[in-house]
Every structure is written in structure tokens, then in C-alpha cells.
Amino acid sequence: MLARTDSTNAEALKLAPGLSGSAWVLAREQFAGRGRRGREWVMPAGNFAGTLVLRPQGGALAAAQLSFVAALALYDALGLACGPAARLAIKWPNDVLLNGGKVAGILLESSGSGPGVQAVAVGIGVNLAGAPDAGAVEPGATPPVSVQGETGHAVDPEEFLDLLAPAFARWQAQLDTYGFAPIRNAWLARAARLGEPIIARTGTAESHGIFEGIDDSGALILRGPAGRQVIPAAEVFFGG
């Protein structure tokens, strides 16, 4: 447990060359955390900022599939932390929702590229004690919530890691043993807005349609007016 760091992902990738297996990096305070597309990840005191650094089996695709492993592990850990009354769902590509609001996010970063991916940092942020101000998020984005705010449960970051780490290990073993198919099926069973209208935005386009699922690579499948689209990377917004 680090008292303070700029980014647990950056810290984890510094450790990677000396690792033979995997390791978790956890920080009480993270002052330069990042989300997707370089966005700042705001971390109020008492929240979870952690990274698992590991060497993936395979290249870039296998590394990317760890995002789905992380989402399933978060779903399980949050289920234990929040209790049976909590409504949890996974939002493509990298968020976990609690009672309809964003409670956790995932960011993968790697060293090396293509078939030469040397290490992957699976960064995970969870709003345990508090959520960022809703006014700080992009218009139309899912509003942030916290575990304590939604359930009244006070969960320490180290206690949460005790729930998350074994859950990640279980799902990673599924991926390593059986491939992506069971991970994909489990993810779809927990997916938010499956079969419902969504909006997928890339840097240059916006697509409206029905969220039909994900393909064997984890890409979004959208059924719109022009037919079926497979979208490898985008931001998803609900409604419309």
C-alpha cells in the first residue's frame, strides 16, 4: 500500500520488468489518475485506486480481454461489498454501475505492442467513500455514485482488495483455461442495456441503435438504421 502516488498504473509499469508473475499496487492517495482518452480520474479520499500488473498470455488481443475479466471481478467484489439489494451492471467498454450510476472504471495500459506486449497494467478505480461532483462529468454521461452513498456501507480500500484480488484470479483462470467465450457469456449476462437503444460515440462519429452484444474480440455490436455495426472502440451513452 502506497501512501501517495501520481498513478498506480504508472507505478505498476515501473515494477513490471522485475516481476516474474503478477502484483497489485494500491495507493491511499492518487493525484494524477487517468481514465479513458486521457481524462482525469478524480479520487476523493477513501476511494480505491489499484492496479494489477501482469504478463498476459498472448498478444494485444489477449491483453485487451483482461478488461472484461476486470469487469467481472469488480461485479463480484462489489456484490459482496454492497449486499444483495444493490443493482449492479457492467457498461461497455470499461465501467461498472451501481443502482444506475457509475461506481467503478477500468483502464488498461501496456508496455510493448502487438505480439510483443510485455506487461499489462489493469488499473481500477472504485468510488467507495465518495463520488466526484456530477457536474464534472461529460454532458449525457452516466452520473457517478459511491458504495457508501448508495448502500451506507463503509468499505476500506484494503478490505475491498481482499474481495477483488481473488475474484480477478478466478476469472483470469477461466480466460487462461477456456478462452474468451465463457468470459464473453458471463459479461453479457451482466451487461447494462443489452437489447436496448444506446448511442456509441467515437472521435468522429455518433451511432444510434440497439445494443446487441459483443463479438469474439470484445467489440460492440450495434443494430442501427443502416444495419449491423461492429465498433471496436467508442464511448457509450444511454437513451436515444
UniProtKB/Swiss-Prot annotation:
Q: Provide a GO CC annotation, any one.
A: cytoplasm
Ordered alphabetically, the record's keywords are: ATP-binding, Biotin, Ligase, Nucleotide-binding
EC class: ligase
Task: State a single Gene Ontology molecular function.
Answer: biotin--[biotin carboxyl-carrier protein] ligase activity
Cross-referenced SUPFAM superfamilies: Class II aaRS and biotin synthetases
Q: Which PROSITE patterns match?
A: BPL_LPL_CATALYTIC
UniProt-listed InterPro entries: aa-tRNA-synth_II/BPL/LPL, Biotin_CoA_COase_ligase, BPL_C, BPL_LPL_catalytic
Residues bound to biotin: 7-9, 30, 34-36, 102
Q: Name one GO biological process term.
A: protein modification process
Q: Which residues form the BPL/LPL catalytic domain?
A: 1-176
Q: Specify one Pfam family.
A: BPL_LplA_LipB
Could you tell me what reaction this enzyme catalyses?
A: biotin + L-lysyl-[protein] + ATP = N(6)-biotinyl-L-lysyl-[protein] + AMP + diphosphate + H(+)
Q: What is its EC number?
A: 6.3.4.15
Role, per record:
Activates biotin to form biotinyl-5'-adenylate and transfers the biotin moiety to biotin-accepting proteins.
Family membership:
Belongs to the biotin--protein ligase family.
The protein here is known as Biotin--[acetyl-CoA-carboxylase] ligase
| Gene this chain is encoded by | birA
